[in-house]
Amino acid sequence: VNSRVTRFVETLVDRGRGNHALFDVLPPQRRALAEQGLLGSSRRAVVVSLPTSSGKTLIAQFRILQAINQFDHERGWVAYLAPTRTLVNQVARRLRREFEPLGGVVEQVSPALEVDNVEISLLTQRDDEREFRVLVTTPEKLDLMIRQGWETEIGRPLTLVVVDEAHNLQSARRGLKLELLLATINSECENAQFLLLTPFISNAREVARWLGGQNSDDISFSVDWQPNDRVIGIAAPVRGHRIRGCSFDYSVELESVHTTRRTLAIDNPIDIGRNYDLAKTFSKASNTSTVAAITAQALQQRGPVIVMHTQPRWVWSLAEKLQLECNRRNPNGRVQLVQNFLQLEYGDDFPLIGMISYGVGVHHAGLSDDVRMLMEWLFEHGELRFLVAT
């Protein structure tokens, strides 16, 4: 399609034959990119409605590169809108990693409803090698920027707006603000095109035509497809034989109660065993947090595990349970970097410093944005076996 897209495809293949190599796209991606012609520049508005994990982000990456190439002479830029600070951080990290080999600069601005001096410097950068081509932020922050005339201040046209989690248009709390933002961009930013990503939206074609106008083509489609199945199971301790006095042995069983397509339904419960390091008797194993820890310890053999609890203080206690000697590992460069940061910020006694040596991370609203971002970073790079979060 264009040189940037061609180079992007080459970088996907050149990663090597590992978990990160990509040799073919998923069926929904193929339909969007090839059959429906998403890479064409004639469509002003596109709504992509696909289930979670169907590859919407990769579709967006191809469309972003096409938009950058289309307005390369004007040094046009793309706004990628995510609804939460955490998702902004996650998207910015991924886009930087993917676009850095292509020379594309990706920046993010905080959701704070002000443009500080650091962001002013970033937005007004005039060096072709350092100026951003993709800006990741929240809808509220972009709304502030548009109302304050930042497209003019930046001096380069806004060429594409990618809206992640676009079903928020239907939200009673945030939908009206997002709708007004898109309407404002549609009327004031003459070069702007739109790509809306959502796992579900009831009026995708209507939204696409609203943004695209009568003289523009539009495309909206939905595909009931996922690359894998999802299993919902219930883990519970089962009392075994008496071992001494009033104490009983135990095991933890996992019963599948729901799968998305009934492909992984299992008639009998799965015995995931016991863990005497976490609980020696049935009464000790009957605590909900202990059951969660035993289950997570068993499942981590298949890959990293996210364990959720309802309150930060319970998150900490659950994370402490997973500090088992069998989980201890020698900290590598990434882990040591995070530990050094935590020591500088919180002191040597901060419990998270020791936890990550066991492959255990913590993530909740009581931690600073920087710490939460570092936990996500370690988890993405496989440095954490467990991420305990609210």
PLM ranges: what are they?
Residues 85-88, 113-115, 140-143, 167-168, ...:
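Conserved nucleotide-binding/hydrolysis micro-motifs of P-loop NTPases
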